[in-house]
């Protein structure tokens, strides 16, 4: 059975970079990223490995909602200048890069789902909990920094909803980290309570007459924003990826791996 280790490139590298005392020390970054990737290979023993990078194009999400991810700090200039050399170094370790046109998340999600549907196992290396919506028994998420798999049961308990409701929760309450708006006046706790009662967005919006006038008014006025928020939060899992699985085989003997543009 294929086991595909899919690394969220900037999620890994920016966290490692943030821990380096000298922001211009690209050699230390290269050493630490190499060490992290070596450890990932040793821990998981994948048959295939890829590291997926964000691209420079404006994402379809930002085109749809210009405030999406607004206010995020830009990549530090030394890291931006040294990133290509790091990617080329990883290729010599047989870790192929995939360059997304815009956001890496949709490419990662598509790779994971395609692997799972082909009866393989996909392990996403990222701390981004947005991947938790990929509800498939052969897709898991690994937090390299805490050396543990994402605990879905603990996340369900923290959020107060089932995994199948994660997207509905973000549609109602939004996601401050990504500047996904949700419905004004509906916070995470009230959204979770509504979903406990009504289970789905469609049932909730068809049941507004059963709610108090004030809350029903908020929901009715925010219905279109909830739909937009759901779309922004939902990962695309069916992108046309022109790749060949053999290009991502993990070998013990390092050799240059292809860098694949999407």
From Swiss-Prot:
Major enzyme class: hydrolase
Record-given protein name: Flap endonuclease Xni
Role description: Has flap endonuclease activity. During DNA replication, flap endonucleases cleave the 5'-overhanging flap structure that is generated by displacement synthesis when DNA polymerase encounters the 5'-end of a downstream Okazaki fragment.
Limits of the 5'-3' exonuclease domain: 164-251
EC number: 3.1.-.-
Family: Belongs to the Xni family.
CC cofactor: Mg(2+); K(+)
InterPro entries per UniProt: 5-3_exonucl_a-hlix_arch_N (IPR020046), 5-3_exonuclease (IPR002421), 5-3_exonuclease_C_sf (IPR036279), DNA_polI_H3TH (IPR020045), FEN (IPR038969), HhH2 (IPR008918), PIN-like_dom_sf (IPR029060), Xni (IPR022895)
Binding residues annotated for K(+), in chain numbering: 172-173, 181, 183, 186
Region listing for Interaction with DNA, in residue ranges: 185-190
A Pfam cross-reference name: 5_3_exonuc
Residues engaged in binding Mg(2+): 105
Biological-process GO terms, alphabetical: DNA replication, Okazaki fragment processing
Keywords per UniProt: DNA-binding, Endonuclease, Hydrolase, Magnesium, Metal-binding, Nuclease, Potassium
Cofactor note: Binds 2 Mg(2+) per subunit. Only one magnesium ion has a direct interaction with the protein, the other interactions are indirect.
Gene name for this UniProt entry: xni
Record-level Gene Ontology MF annotations: 5'-3' exonuclease activity; 5'-flap endonuclease activity; DNA binding; magnesium ion binding; potassium ion binding
């Amino acid at each position: 059975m294929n086991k595909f280790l899919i690394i969220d490139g900037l999620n890994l590298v920016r966290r490692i970079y943030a821990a380096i005392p000298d922001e211009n020390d690209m050699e230390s970054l290269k050493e630490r990223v190499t060490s992290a990737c070596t450890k990932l290979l040793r821990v998981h023993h994948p048959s295939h490995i890829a590291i997926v990078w964000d691209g420079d194009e404006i994402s379809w999400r930002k085109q749809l909602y210009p405030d999406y991810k607004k206010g995020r700090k830009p990549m530090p200039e030394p890291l931006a200048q040294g990133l290509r050399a790091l990617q080329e170094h990883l290729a010599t370790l047989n870790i192929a890069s995939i360059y997304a046109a815009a956001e890496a998340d949709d490419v990662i999600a598509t790779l994971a789902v395609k692997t799972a549907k082909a009866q393989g196992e996909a392990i996403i290396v990222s701390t981004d909990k947005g991947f938790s919506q990929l509800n498939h028994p052969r897709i898991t998420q690994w937090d390299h920094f805490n050396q543990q798999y994402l605990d879905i049961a603990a996340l369900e308990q923290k959020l107060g909803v089932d995994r199948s409701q994660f997207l509905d929760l973000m549609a109602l309450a939004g996601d401050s980290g990504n500047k996904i708006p949700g419905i004004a006046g509906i916070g995470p706790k009230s959204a979770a309570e509504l979903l406990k009662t009504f289970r789905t967005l469609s049932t909730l919006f068809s049941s507004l007459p059963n709610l108090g006038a004030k809350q029903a008014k908020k929901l009715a006025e925010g219905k279109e924003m909830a739909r937009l928020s759901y779309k922004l939060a939902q990962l695309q899992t069916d992108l046309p990826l022109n790749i060949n699985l053999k290009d991502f085989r993990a070998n013990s003997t390092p050799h240059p791996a292809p860098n694949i543009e999407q």
